[in-house]
Amino acid sequence: MPLDRAKVDNSMLIQGWIEDCVVDFKRLYPNLPEKVIRQTLADVAASHGHDVRAVICNDYDDDLMLYCTLLSVYDWIQKKKPILGGNGTFFRDQDKASSPIANVILGRIAARKAFQKERDTWDQDSYEYAYFDMMQKEAKIKINSIYGSFGTTSFQLYNYYTAAATTGTAQSLISATAISFEAFLSDNAKFKSIDEFVTFFRNITNRDTYTFSYLEFPVIKDRQKVFDRYWNHFFTEDLKTDTAYEIMHKLIWSCSEEELTRLWYKNNLYTFMSTPTMMRLLRGVFAKTESFRNPNAVPDNIQAEMDLIWAYTNDFVFYNHAYTERINRLVHDRRKSVIVIDTDSNMINIEPWVDFLKDNVWTQSGSTMDDDNLTYASVNCIAFLVTHMVRSLLAKYCKDCNVLDRMASRINMKNEFYYAKMLLANVKKRYAALTKLQEGKEIKVGSKKELDVKGYDFRKAGVNEEISAKLFDILLTCIMRPDEVSVSRILSKLDFIEKDIIQSLKQGKRTYLLRMNCKVAAAYSKPESMGAYLAPLLWNAVYPENEIMVPDKLDVVILRGVKEPEILALKDKYPDEVERIEKYIFHGPLGERFRNKGLVYLALPNTGDDIPEMWWEFIDINKTVARNLGTFEPVMAALNIPMITSGKEYKYFGNILDI
């Protein structure tokens, strides 16, 4: 249903849209009177606009339901300025309401920072460092548990919307930083419609204010050059319609020299850094400094130059406006700079930047730094810039969401790690990274923090500690540290581990047994199908004098489905054990299951004793090998080395590459 004229005239959203469009249409149709443009836009809004019905719910106020329209909600937001959550939840700001639980969170945040500060005064391999690192992690867990509790129905302050708002805001923030990094570092925020270009154009030529004169840099006068750059910036070729061509052409041909220059350098980092002014500043930084390890503690003798580099970059390169479809872009679009996204972090590829400085600055600056320090200085130059960039970005995000200035500074991202190499996987939150710097401090070779592993199976709970340590060593020494990866060396070490597992199992050693978190029957919906339940059940039936108490984490022997006749064959040698197996296992409450499937899992008590000799011949060696080495499969898959299946249970790594 068309909008009535009064609603068009009184809607803050529509009137704001008209004001924006007037600016654009005056460029597209310079001879058309502004009054006619405004009238036409108002007519379009009235004939094509729809005021969608909306509902505002407050479940802190007896589930109050307010039925309204989307335009009225927008006007209310503009007038009342509530804090906007990531999922459309509105909050009163701290000047209008107080929250005791918020003070608890702020207290925990302050405590965590204090622990981190104290931690960093100690050597990274010391007991004190580990203690304060553990304490700051505990504080973080407490903070996150408070957030999560709001989504738990049993919590006194449970709210249907609050937990989702926290998650939605975090997702919105991380996607906002990701697309901004893509745009800033690699000009990779493509236009998905001509409307996006028009908004981009309007922000640069009409909305933004600038500190420096465009005349300080090479002036761009070639309109075709600017047009070609942005015409090739559409996400897909089918967006390059005749209408889009006409609009872009008219807008760019309406530009002054200053507007062309500012359009050319926006999100065009390397072109801008190649200008004489920026080259002089960058070479000056490298000529004057002897070491630049921490972007948050710039050496005094280059502070002025670094501040000026950022000021120029902020003025000419950084586009500090929201991009549309941020979350969708994050999930679906091909990225160039943001190579890994974790819950609250973006990991960015800065190799192009380091290569750029290596080719244009290192030698030309006359720097006396060695290659390592030149690399660190290059890394921290861009870290300094992106730290300032993301600070400005998040400040504007908070302002747009009506967060009070004094609270906005709490939403921030910091540069924490410099990873020299990363091994990625085709699964989210799974990577291995060789750490060189943490907050400016060099991570020594052999330090516990040298290799950061997240999400890979061989580091997860339940994996044998011996296997985990050996596979970790292969990853570190054969893949992450070397400049070139030797596949033959990796396979040789894996083969050695496999032979060691086989030899160990044949001798009844528990060294390479799987580790399971065994629980009572009530913890499982179908306990009879869970190896973690059946394993201690078998042990307790056979060895009641050394009973296992659950819940507990236990070493578990994988058996090859031992059937009743095989057990009966041992009656002469192990009469008591066989009798108990017959009575309590094969003919006990779960007898039918054991008679059909056989004995597959046997738990061992945490005494350190070896596997009882009675079971040695029944150990499923192939399955145990595959289950242990299989935890390394995602690492090898990242190197395009697949596991080869041989038989039902046995897998091994071959020397065949997936290409």
Predicted feature residues:
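Conserved acidic
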Residues: 1-659
